[in-house]
């Protein structure tokens, strides 16, 4: 056709590095520690809840309420209302979406207008930038910077900090929203109360909405505490809090997410939702509702999944850290999430000339080399940065440690072979 087919809002966002690395991994005998999903079953109670939804009330095969299956919106309002210290109305303050991804897209489409600026904290979950651009907005980036590490010690995600003056300087009269991700993907940083108070004060000062992606909120380790910024004084009325049943119950294929927020903002998300997705799968929502009802009864008790799961994943994290160190990698200990990043600076010094395009960031060339030669899949951390900042953070790669014991043992075998070759 002579006419340009694609909308201009798609310019510059058509390349997806995930496709390249997934394809490369499929061509080799590898242990895939790249993509963020568990390779073990969801908890029994969640599977049983889905079975109840499929085999029970036949009306669960039909549409439910556009903005969420009523038992699900009710339990989300009750559960998170207590956590956030808010009276949450299931009809006005809760929207069920097609996963956390759908929640993010709906939020950007509802709030971001042509020329609006959106502050994104780096490293960032890679969809934030294209979603901002598709809505007509301009992403504005501010980076977490790693602090010094004592000789012989491992770094921690808690040492990566925002510069308060730099962050404040990113706000302008065009700033519409700030995107916060805690625990952070890929870094695993859990923002402290002091850090959240800084963000909150700037959002209030400049009348900016905070879109907070908290899909990993139950995966917090070493006694750290997840704090929702919406629970801070003056923030509920300007915050959209996004969650994911896939991450919460280790069932990423269910694709149920949600947004919590004040009605004066949520009404605009409902407009986008009803004119795009319209409705989310009823049976998945019913299973999530039953699972949350169970967890509410057991909340903070030793038998709660929200207590047991992070304990198990901390053991997986520690296993991976020990194993990666055996070949000279230097993990940054994450406070939360599915992921850890590891410093490959020593390899960059020893093997500076890995194959690849001249302008290709080193971490991408290293991951390709590792897939082909060592049989391990990771994700280059530079893809979680804006293009101008990628060259400053091309000496880190990301691993997912939320994996079955058999997968971690297979990783160990690959690393043993690697160690012999050193």
Curated annotation (Swiss-Prot):
It is found in: Cytoplasm, Cytosol. Substrate binds at residues 36, 185, 398. This is Kynurenine--oxoglutarate transaminase 1. One of its GO terms (molecular function) is kynurenine-oxoglutarate transaminase activity. Pathway: Amino-acid degradation; L-kynurenine degradation; kynurenate from L-kynurenine: step 1/2. It comes from Homo sapiens. Keywords: Aminotransferase, Cytoplasm, Lyase, Pyridoxal phosphate, Transferase. It comes from the Eukaryota. GO terms for biological process: biosynthetic process; kynurenine metabolic process; L-kynurenine catabolic process; response to bacterium. The gene is KYAT1. Its cofactor is pyridoxal 5'-phosphate. GO terms for cellular component: cytoplasm; cytosol; mitochondrion. It catalyses: L-kynurenine + 2-oxoglutarate = kynurenate + L-glutamate + H2O; 3-phenylpyruvate + L-glutamine = 2-oxoglutaramate + L-phenylalanine; an S-substituted L-cysteine + H2O = a thiol + pyruvate + NH4(+). Inhibited by tryptophan, indole-3-pyruvic acid, 3-indolepropionic acid, DL-indole-3-lactic acid, indole-3-acetic acid (IAC), amino-oxyacetate (AOAA), aminooxy-phenylpropionic acid (AOPP) and Tris. InterPro entries: Aminotransferase_I/II_large (IPR004839), Kynurenine-oxoglutarate_AT (IPR051326), PyrdxlP-dep_Trfase (IPR015424), PyrdxlP-dep_Trfase_major (IPR015421), PyrdxlP-dep_Trfase_small (IPR015422). Gene3D superfamilies: Aspartate Aminotransferase, domain 1, Type I PLP-dependent aspartate aminotransferase-like (Major domain). Homodimer.
């Amino acid at each position: 056709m002579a006419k340009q087919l694609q909308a201009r809002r798609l310019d510059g966002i058509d390349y997806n590095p995930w496709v390249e690395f997934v394809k490369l991994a499929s061509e080799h005998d590898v242990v895939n520690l790249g993509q963020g999903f568990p390779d073990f079953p969801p908890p029994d109670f969640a599977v049983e809840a889905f079975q109840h939804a499929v085999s029970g009330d036949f009306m669960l095969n039909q549409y439910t309420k556009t903005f969420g299956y009523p038992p699900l919106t009710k339990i989300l309002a009750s559960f998170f209302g207590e956590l956030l210290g808010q009276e949450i109305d299931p009809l006005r303050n809760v929207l069920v979406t097609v996963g956390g991804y759908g929640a993010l897209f709906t939020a950007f489409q509802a709030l971001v207008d042509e020329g609006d600026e959106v502050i994104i904290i780096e490293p960032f979950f890679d969809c934030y930038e294209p979603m901002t651009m598709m809505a007509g907005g301009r992403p504005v980036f501010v980076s977490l910077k790693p602090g010094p590490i004592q000789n012989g010690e491992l770094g921690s995600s808690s040492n990566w900090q925002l510069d308060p003056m730099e962050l404040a300087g990113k706000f302008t009269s065009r700033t519409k929203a700030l995107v916060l991700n805690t625990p952070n993907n890929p870094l695993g940083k859990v923002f402290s109360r002091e850090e959240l108070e800084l963000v909150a004060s700037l959002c209030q000062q400049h009348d900016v909405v905070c879109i907070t992606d908290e899909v990993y909120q139950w995966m917090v380790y070493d006694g750290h505490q997840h704090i929702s910024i919406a629970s801070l004084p003056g923030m509920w009325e300007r915050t959209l809090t996004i969650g994911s049943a896939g991450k919460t119950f280790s069932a990423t294929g269910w694709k149920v997410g949600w947004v919590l927020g004040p009605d004066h903002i949520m009404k605009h998300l409902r407009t986008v939702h009803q004119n795009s997705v319209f409705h989310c799968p009823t049976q998945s929502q019913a299973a999530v509702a039953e699972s949350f009802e169970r967890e509410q009864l057991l909340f903070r008790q030793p038998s709660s999944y929200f207590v047991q799961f992070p304990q198990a994943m901390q053991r997986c994290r520690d296993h991976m850290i020990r194993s990666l160190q055996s070949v000279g990698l230097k993990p940054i200990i994450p406070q939360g999430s599915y992921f850890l990043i590891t410093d490959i600076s020593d390899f960059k010094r020893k093997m500076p000339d890995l194959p690849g395009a001249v302008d290709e960031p080193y971490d991408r060339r290293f991951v390709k080399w590792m897939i082909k030669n060592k049989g391990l899949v990771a994700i280059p951390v530079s893809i979680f940065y804006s293009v101008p900042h990628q060259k400053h953070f091309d000496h880190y790669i990301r691993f997912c440690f939320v994996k079955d014991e058999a997968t971690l043992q297979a990783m160990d075998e690959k690393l043993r072979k690697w160690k012999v070759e050193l």
